[in-house]
Amino acid sequence: MTLDRLSHGPSRSHLTPLVAGLLLAGCGLALASSHREAPFITTAPKVDGTDFYMFRSYEPNRADYVTLIANYLPLQDAYGGPNYFALDPSALYEIHIDNNGDATEDISFQFRFENKLANNGAGVSLNIGGKQVGIPLIQSGTVANLKDGNLQVAETYSVSVVRGDRRTGNVQAVTSSSNGSAVFDKPVDNIGTKTIADYAGYAAKHIHSVNIPGCAMPARLFVGQRQDPFAVNLGTIFDLVNAPVGVITNPALINAAPNAIGDKNVTTLALEVHKSCLTNGDDVIGGWTTVSLRQARLLNPSPPAGYQTTEKPGGAWVQVSRLGMPLVNEVVIGLKDKDKFNASRPSGDSQFIDYVTHPTLPALLEIALALPGTAPTNFPRTDLVTTFLTGIKGVNQPRNVVGSEMLRLNTAIAAVPFALQNRLGIVGNILAGGNDNAGYPNGRRPKDDVVDISLVAVMGGLCMANGNADALGFGAACKPSAVPLGATAFKLHDAVDQAVVPLLPGFPYLNTPLPGSK
């Protein structure tokens, strides 16, 4: 997406006073995580991306690493057996990195999955009255180890790194640092405490040290089920923001409502890579995640015995899911274009420009809250264009940026230990006068409350900071008088506190998944 005012500037590891003023207002438009956000993706939950995170690792002794996390398969009930939540072996899951600001991937990490029955495809059988009969469950006993013999279904995956175009670039296998294998084991989902007594310990055995071709330092890799790390007042928001204005504008009530998805799990693809492997002469990188499916599929009306034998896919890869900033497609892109956005690449984002320059969400909030005349009046919304499409100059804008939607991270800004992180990222840090410049919108950490930050921006917080003298360069129309809410815009929240979500202090950072039974 392009506008005359899209700026080009060098990245910096510090915050100028001008930038501090901008960040005080908050950035983004997300009101909910990317769960079931587009019509087509509701039919294919295994390839539905829910959240994307990209941040400097804050685990001790990992300061020079960047963690990439892509979550898929939303709203998993922990008790969802007997098949649980294996990922799609017919899909291509990818994490893309743009390291020169041109809106095109320079590095892609590709994940492919394979799910096989034990005993060379024969599965597990029991002797029942002299006959060997296959069992109906994915496990035949307790599970504790890699390649556990009591698992009837073995879930494995491979990872490749592609340099250049995702389909025509140079493809090389990511391999285990310990044995050179290009195939990795995925832990079974958290069936329950009787089957897996120590799931945290079991899952930790599936954290792999890996070698990435072209990278001098080894990386870490984990794929498996986690507790959904996102906190949001989901049902209330989509029910026309069914909450009193006095609650969502009172900072003392930031945790007045329960987290609607606090009892759900997701499936995580996590990769921790040395920052030198991701950058290319600029400290700022952009990232996003996608999934593609084969263009055609045949369904066998008489599938043979085995595992997932009904479908036979073929043809070219077709992208069906896309997620960068949290979350554009859910509450910014119009319903008629949601599937189109999921199929698009950042280089083609000019087709969606009106959704950012003239967003409908503020007007919808006026209707939902019965507060006419509260939406900002500055058009085009150059404040939001900067946040979504270029990054913020002096923080996370690449030197030669082409306007496009993706999450952007300045890898030169140091990580902050978990206990010292501000849940409002850079916005909260400015308010507190602290030293945490490593959070959203400079990348995104699991603790960052992107919902609350985003509500501030969508209702005009950036223009409040821009002032009457166009201090931030958003144009003369972006000024306090264009923000009917005034200072109240800084108090908005969804009444669910991201900071209370349980998280781990180190890789893969997201909490142990909830068990199917206790």
Mark where each language-model region is.
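Bacterial N-terminal signal peptides
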Residues: 16-27
